[in-house]
């Protein structure tokens, strides 16, 4: 059916840059929608040739649920029974289920998933417990202890650690930057003198609230 069009396709293929051709070959390993393919053909800055899990990270960021870390697994792990002679090779291929590129993709997916519950911050312990459960139940592997901290330099490309020193939680970059901006604005406003004081005695008003408990230290601080 397509024989008459093959010369046109061949000329089009040969006219592409080597980078675009390599990207197309890489993307053909996965079951992807056309809009995802088009994005990664155009986005030459995204190094999917070395890290195919950037595809699932981007899809999580854009709430494209049809493409997950598991989708990328199918094309990144060598499987001659499916891929024949075209098995993936390093640096593209996933070396193990504990491949840090794969783990980072799982973390990013989880961070976007919990947004529906109103959570923008997840403790490092909670996230490692989540990964540990996945490894144990689905992949039969043992997650190295403190992996989010020991591999921080690689992971923080995609999300931030909070606080920066001695972190206890992780957060998507866009939400971390948003909160940093708001903190900066509020700090600057707090430094300014009030032009028109209201004259209200806020302490007395707070203490008159029915929920105020003078015997409770936390209530006093609030």
Positions of predicted regions on the chain:
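Helicase P-loop NTPase motor core of nucleic-acid translocases
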Residues: 1-222
């Amino acid at each position: 059916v397509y024989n008459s069009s093959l010369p046109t396709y061949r000329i089009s293929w040969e006219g592409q840059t080597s980078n675009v051709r390599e990207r197309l070959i890489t993307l053909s390993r996965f079951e992807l929608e056309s809009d995802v393919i088009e994005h990664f053909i155009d986005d030459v800055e995204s190094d999917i040739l070395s890290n195919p899990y950037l595809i699932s990270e981007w899809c999580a960021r854009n709430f494209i649920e049809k493409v997950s870390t598991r989708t990328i697994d199918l094309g990144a792990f060598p499987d001659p029974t499916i891929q024949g002679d075209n098995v993936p090779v390093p640096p593209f291929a996933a070396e193990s289920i504990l491949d840090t590129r794969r783990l980072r993709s799982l973390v990013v997916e989880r961070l976007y998933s919990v947004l529906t519950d109103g959570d923008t911050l997840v403790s490092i312990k909670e996230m490692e417990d989540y990964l540990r459960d996945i490894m144990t139940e689905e992949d039969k592997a043992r997650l190295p202890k403190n992996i989010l901290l020991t591999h921080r330099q690689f992971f923080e490309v995609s999300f931030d650690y909070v606080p920066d020193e001695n972190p206890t939680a992780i957060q998507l970059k866009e939400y971390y930057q948003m909160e940093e901006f708001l903190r900066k604005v509020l700090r600057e406003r707090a430094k300014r003198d009030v032009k028109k004081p209201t004259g209200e005695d806020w302490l007395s008003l707070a203490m008159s609230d029915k929920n105020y408990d003078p015997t409770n230290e936390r209530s006093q601080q609030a």
